[in-house]
Design a protein with these regions (language model features):
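Extended substrate-binding grooves/exosites of carbohydrate-active enzymes
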Residues: 1-222
Length: 222
């Protein structure tokens, strides 16, 4: 890290800074040094490099230990303080942020399998089934995460929640929560689309939310 971090950040920013899709830079995600003064100094240093080579864009990173990051001052030094999950803690977080706003840097982690519908329909953070699937009704999530509606309510009700990055757009190999020890489950259930890139039912919820120029109509079994 000491040998390559400055070079990597510099090359990253210089290579992509003219790309129109870049709205901010991220210097880390869930790093273990969130609680320490060493982490604060590293965050300041890497953020300064981003500012040096691109003064036009702010810098963020995703923090999963909100209490530690706020106590150490780690969150307070970021241009855009990003918090992963635990949306119910946003109220407490914002009280300690001089920036006056926060970002959902990793949100939702709702789990579902495309075309699989479980009955009875229940909201649960620990539902599992013998077939190793998750319900496509999008009522299931993890112990650390939440449903999309929780994120949207915070964004609608409080202007200091400036947006979100959803985990995740596509399913991927690895992290098969809630079936981490269940063979042959070997890929995630978090995706808005599945491994083949086909949209799950949740895709249409996000489309309706994000696409304000077109109507969204979607039918599913009940």
């Amino acid at each position: 890290f000491k040998e390559w971090s400055d070079k990597d950040i510099t090359n990253l920013v210089k290579h992509h800074r003219n790309h129109p899709s870049i709205v901010m830079w991220s210097i880390g995600n869930e790093i273990p040094e969130q609680w320490s003064q060493e982490g604060v100094q590293i965050a300041k240093h890497l953020q300064d490099i981003c500012h040096q080579y691109d003064p036009s864009r702010p810098v963020t990173q995703g923090m999963d230990k909100a209490e530690d990051a706020l106590k150490s001052g780690f969150a307070q030094v970021m241009d855009v303080p990003g918090f992963n999950y635990r949306v119910h803690k946003y109220y407490k977080n914002i009280e300690q942020l001089p920036q006056g706003f926060l970002l959902g840097s990793e949100t939702a982690s709702t789990v579902s399998s495309r075309g699989v519908y479980k009955f009875p329909v229940v909201v649960s953070d620990k539902a599992t089934y013998p077939d190793g699937q998750c319900s496509s009704y999008d009522t299931e999530y993890c112990s650390w995460s939440n449903l999309p509606d929780d994120d949207w309510k915070m964004q609608d009700d409080y202007s200091w929640v400036i947006g979100e990055f959803v985990w995740t757009g596509y399913d991927y190999l690895g992290e098969p929560t809630p079936y981490d020890t269940y063979w042959p489950s070997r890929s995630s259930y978090f995706g808005i689309c599945d491994l083949a890139g086909l949209p799950k039912d949740r895709y249409y919820m996000y489309r309706a939310r994000w696409n304000e120029q077109q109507h969204t109509t979607h039918l599913l079994p009940h």
